[in-house]
Amino acid sequence: MNYKTSLIEIPKALIQKNNIEQIKKLSALKKAKNHILSGELVAFPTETVYGLGADATNGKAVKKIFKAKGRPQDNPLIAHIANLDQFERVVDTKIDNDLEKIINTFWPGPLTVILPKSNLISKITTANLDTVGVRMPSHPVALSLIEITDRPLAAPSANTSGLPSPTRAEHVLDDLKGKIPLILGGGACKVGVESTIIKVEKEKIIILRPGGISREELAKISERKIVRKNNSKNNKPLAPGMKYKHYSPETKVFLYTGKKEKLHRYLKNNENKKLALVFTSETIDELKKRNEFVKNKNIKIIDIGSKTDLKSIANKLFYILRELDKSENEIIIVEKIPERGIGEAVMNRLYKAASEKL
């Protein structure tokens, strides 16, 4: 089915004031509510990336997400909620004190928790798993939409599956125009990478996907050991982002690991190619001092920010990759950054996006 996709911007003033009650009164939200309750899709902003939402209790509606994105149906979706009453309706378990502390600390925010699901959640949403990832986003437009529909919203990133996640409404329009009826615009996403997904066990917290909440932040709250789980290609994914290739633009991405001689040799041997170098401020300054920049009009230099401000780098990453994908670059070379804090989430995305290392 082809849609005439509408993009409606929510007033910035209401978003900045976090005025959920006024946002819910907007005609755009009422339109979005009608779409959701009639089994249609609505794209909306969160603090991480834009989400493509459907009623998580309606299997037919959720199937439309997989179709619009071209997403494999064994890749589970996260159920987004707006309050703890909804949380109690979507899970079938009692939470312990440690998990309660984690939820109270990081919700609303970029943290998803895997728990046994209730019968309310469609098995299409969970890819036939008996567990569901649950998250309470902090963006006022997301919370307004979830509250006004009184439905948990299944919502992966609102993009074509495999491409960089959308951090602006126009990114959603680029990918999904004609495939969905409505996009709610809410400005640029503050975090810029998806939520952290965790599974809490008796003695440990398993990070299934690094994201907007770092392992260091989790360690400050919980005494449990924190470990990272990587999914093999043959295993059924417990959470989004574990099995399939993600986050990659159509232009080839190479990862620069700091080997200067290898980089210099590559640039020299490929001086006729149109290249984009996405480097940190420190590396750009160092190369300038050594006069190692190749004076070549085919090379575009993008400063992604300082290694001392990894949150800023995370915020820009998907936006930069999408913008460079619109240019005539043959290769995008992105510098590896420290895997601490949110840098772990950034590198998780870059490892998946890159086809080669330098």
Where are these regions (language model features)?
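Active-site-adjacent structural elements in enzyme catalytic cores
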Residues: M1-L358
